[in-house]
């Protein structure tokens, strides 16, 4: 899982980009976590609790994206994926979920979060 962090020099916004199949992580980092160091630290602390066996799982529901953690992996997904459709879409018109959902190992997420924390902290 590759990623890159940038800061928009005009707006000061922190931006994260992740490799293919993990694009939604970039949106989650940029839009849900942003420069909130306390929120980033909270997720890091929860990961440690799960790794140590103090907790089995955890969910953080955000405005547009949510995070599910368990002993094995992390799932980041667009909240819109949870809505049931009342109608059938043609195959060519089906919703593309690959850019709206991603899975990664807890260690990979922890490493990326630590990097994001340091990047944001340096930029504030």
From Swiss-Prot:
InterPro entries: UPF0231. NCBIfam families: PRK05248.3-2 (NF003581). Belongs to the UPF0231 family. This is UPF0231 protein SO_3983. It comes from Shewanella oneidensis (strain ATCC 700550 / JCM 31522 / CIP 106686 / LMG 19005 / NCIMB 14063 / MR-1).
